[in-house]
Amino acid sequence: MRVVTFNLHAGVDGWGRPTGALAHLIALAPDIAICSELWRGDDGTDFVATLTDTTNLRGQFVALARAERVTTGHGPRRWQPLLAHFTGERGLYFREHRELTPQQREHRRVRPQVETGEWGIGLFTTLPIESLEVKSLGRLPREKVRRALIVARLDLDGRSIHVLALHGAHLSHGSPLLLRRVARIVAALDPVPPIILAGDFNCWRPLLRVLLPGWNSLARARTWPGQHPHSQIDHILGRGPWRRLDAGASDGGSDHRALRADVALDELDVRTLG
């Protein structure tokens, strides 16, 4: 079974130029796809429709913010403005809970062609779906978007498994509080089925082991920033008798790399679980 988690950044870079992120995800042929920063345009590009129309993937999309996606961006070769983390990027605009920066307002003025739509997270799979549930994680005070956990129960060759999709907050915005909420949801699940928890955690693996103990990493590879990665902040975590067959990360044009893990359930451990 192939699990892929990929932050698609709505299919544009930090200047609003189109990327091939969605095509890259589809080319990886996942059995389970955890998609952060999916885009559903009001009158244009719809990533969910593309996924379900061109593949056998089915699942759940959760809108976490209204946004504007720039469609006329241009800029230098770098993926986004050099100081984008301080002045804001120029590819996506979120205004529900925070004002745009002066630099963003100026760019919005001179690059008026934008597409409005919904920005969010998705969990899609080719496996039979037993149940799907969305757990709200709220919005942290410093955040410009809401957060949610998608909880799926799937059938893998006659065995039930849980798969959870998360796009976590940054540490500076209060991610420990968010991860405590995730831990409480996990603790309330049926303890028998093996679990996979995957997504863009915005958190390094050493810290994640402290904030979310008791998980095994099913894929270890640098995922951020996408062009010259030095850190892993996207993760595929497992509980239960998962066995990693292969794993890696690949550049699909986004600011994160796509992380994949080919995994199997250990037959002996599954039988002992009854």
Locations of regions flagged by a protein language model:
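Active-site regions of metal-assisted phosphoester/phosphodiester hydrolases
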Residues: M1-I32, G41-D43, R58-Q60, R66-A67, ...
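Glycosyltransferases and closely related glycan-assembly transferases
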Residues: V48-T55
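A short beta-strand element within the Helicase C-terminal
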Residues: E37-L38
